[in-house]
Amino acid sequence: TLAIEQARAAKIAFSPPMTEIEATYAVPKDSKITKVAEVDAPGIRISVPEKAGYELYLTRTIKNATLIKSKGTPAAVELFTKKGADALGGLRPALLDTLPQMPDARLLEGNFMTVNHGLGTPRAGRTGAGADYLKAFVDEMVASGFIARSIEKNGVKGLAAVAPKKP
């Protein structure tokens, strides 16, 4: 699956979304920050890996906090755990996986954005049949509950199936 992004949509014909994943923050356990909205405050330093979809979103939307961009997730985690950043931005599943390396951290409830994922086919030189097929396939997989069951069966934390469309 691919993150459905406007920048990619020029070259990729996306299916409807199948799943969504939350982006949130890790903060030190003793932080006074208890809500996602409290992170965008003067003096708060947010560590994020550069060029991640959520980093691009935060670059557009953060008004008061300072983003500190690192080359990759390991560097962003190190900046948070060893160099005193006030928050670490990331996708909830990745942050959950990283929590054992960050024993003095906790995740905030809620999210600052969600990322929808779907299937895609190249736009260039296509007749649209592939995109039409993907749309029908994804609609059926979501409506039948297959996506939700697969997420549950495989124990994927932080990932959710999108709600089926109402007829």
Short names for language-model regions:
Residues 1-38, 106-112:
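Acidic, polar ligand-binding/catalytic clefts
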Residues 1-11, 56-60, 81-113:
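A ligand-binding cleft/hinge motif common to bilobed small-molecule-binding domains
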Residues 42-46, 85, 136-137:
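Short active-site oxyanion
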Residues 37, 56-60, 74-82, 93-97, ...:
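Solvent-exposed, polar/charged alpha-helical surfaces in well-ordered, non-transmembrane soluble domains
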Residues 22-78, 92-93:
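Bilobed "Venus flytrap"/periplasmic-binding protein-like clamshell domains
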Residues 53-70, 107-108, 138-167:
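Ligand-binding clefts/hinges and TM-proximal coupling segments of bilobed small-molecule sensing domains
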Residues 19-27, 92, 96-139, 157-167:
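Periplasmic-binding protein-like
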Residues 3-8, 31-33, 52-55, 74-75, ...:
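Solvent-exposed loop/turn segments at secondary-structure junctions
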